[in-house]
Amino acid sequence: MKNCISRRSFLKAAGILGAAGALAACGGSSSTSTAASSTASSAAASAASTGASIKLWTYPIGGWGNDDTVQNLISSFNAKYPDIKVTVEYLDYTNGDDQVNTAIEGGSAPDLVMEGPERLVANWGAKGVMAPLNDLWTDDAKKDIYASVESACHNDKGDYYEYPLCMTAHCMAVNMTKVKEVGADQYIDTDKHTWSTDGFLKTVDALYKGGYENVAAIYCSGQGGDQGTRAIINNMYGGTFTDAAHTKYTADSAENIKAIQALYDAKGVNFDPSINGGEEITLFRNGTLQMAFCWNIAQQLNADTAAAGQTISGDEIFPMAFPTESGDPKLCGGIWGFGIFDNGDEAKIKAAKTFIEFIAADPSQVKDSVLASTYFPVRTSVGDIYAGNEVMSEYSKFMGYLGDYYQITPGWTTARTEWWNMLQRVGSGEAVETAVKTFVDNANAAAAAEA
């Protein structure tokens, strides 16, 4: 078995930080999950939906996981629609899916949920529990929203189950202070934030030989932050996670097998079944790890435990695209927006659509809604909302590296579980070819069953 960071060591390290800020799509909060609720309401009448009361459940999508931020947005909504009462519950990526699924099974699903197409379209939409949003997708909306985003928000029948608000590119990060210390910055194009696969492996080796035993972790305790482990493996030698038509999973390709084997063989890279993406971020911030595969602009801006862009000891955190042989990285994209659960109440569905239209489409509001997320707009009409912001302008370079949004492939929920199980088996010494075959067989069986 490859070395891993023991759970005791992780907890000891994490104790230094307290509640570390692991944000959207990277494992949620590293502290114990508790759902907080809050309400915004007004006694005035609304022409849109008199007396309607709706529930919004949101994952921690940048500032959309912060109650003060969300309440300010709801206050803006209530200024225009004062009679629609909005109750908010905050989820995380550790227990959020279980909470939603339990609510669905118990007939108490929220009216609105904020997350991405992999949940709203490929999961809950495919299960028939979401209300179609086709009427919100007007011709003007389709012209304004990026085509790559629009295509991810509907199923193969053309039914839309997500109305998007914001997007970003997931990347990785390195402790640049330590990289420079061992002379490995020569392998990094700091202007483009890119490097070759050979340069990446040489950097890992230099850090390991420089005394940093734990350079990076292939975290695999669960699905939290799994976009990072998929991306490092797919990018290294040009592999893909699915076919272009999003009908089957392709992790058993020669390119992917080569990448997994290279990571397994690399000294300093540990397959660790005791941590997820959020916990990897904690270990990166406190200096236990020198690289993080679970990263995006929300992490770069996070200042909960140290100054933004720094580790807890003050080292420079430098965001990077994943390494490639071709020089053309393909980053996983995050798309976030709103979906409506069909609870059989047309008045609530109407009120929920009114909320979506205001927050995600109203020209007077949408900029503030996106800014709250700390991500980027999906609408061309919104323009450059970060003009003059050096950090955001620099990070916008990653948007040009966005790859295929394959998270809407049938069988996605099963594939995510099979993925971290596969990585655990590799870490335990199972042959890579055997492990990926099991993954592909099980994931594709699920895809065929849902097609």
Label each region the model flagged.
Residues 363-366, 373-383, 399-451:
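Conserved C-terminal helix/tail region of periplasmic/extracytoplasmic solute-binding proteins
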